[in-house]
């Protein structure tokens, strides 16, 4: 199992948001930047405009869990920051929708490991 570390510092987020490539899905947006390490780094940012902390934490848990399940299929050496789209209603946020969105973003960015046939 790969080990992904979480981004913790403000400057780490800023570096990815300014220099990373932008990909968008229906529910989430992603900024992806390659790094020189052999492991992945993950950051999740949910705006305060989502009023209740319970809802923000629920979205973070859904994103983290989906990433954990897709982690084996993702190439290492990348830093990914996921952002929640402000206009999307939280009621539609479920595991399946976010997983589909995340898979689409990883396919667009070509981060999935190619399977040999």
Model-assigned labels for residue ranges:
Residues 1-117:
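Positively charged, solvent-exposed patches that mediate nucleic-acid binding
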């Amino acid at each position: 199992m790969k080990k992904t570390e979480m981004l913790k510092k403000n400057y780490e987020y800023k570096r990815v948001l300014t220099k990373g490539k932008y990909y968008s899905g229906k529910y989430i947006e992603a900024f992806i930047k390659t790094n020189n390490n052999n492991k992945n780094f993950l950051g999740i940012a949910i705006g305060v405009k989502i009023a209740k902390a319970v809802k923000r934490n629920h979205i973070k848990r859904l994103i983290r869990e989906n990433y954990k399940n897709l982690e084996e299929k993702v190439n290492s050496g990348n830093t990914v920051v996921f952002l929640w789209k402000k206009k999307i209603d939280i009621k539609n946020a479920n595991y399946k929708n976010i997983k589909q969105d995340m898979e689409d973003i990883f396919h667009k960015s070509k981060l999935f490991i190619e399977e040999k046939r």
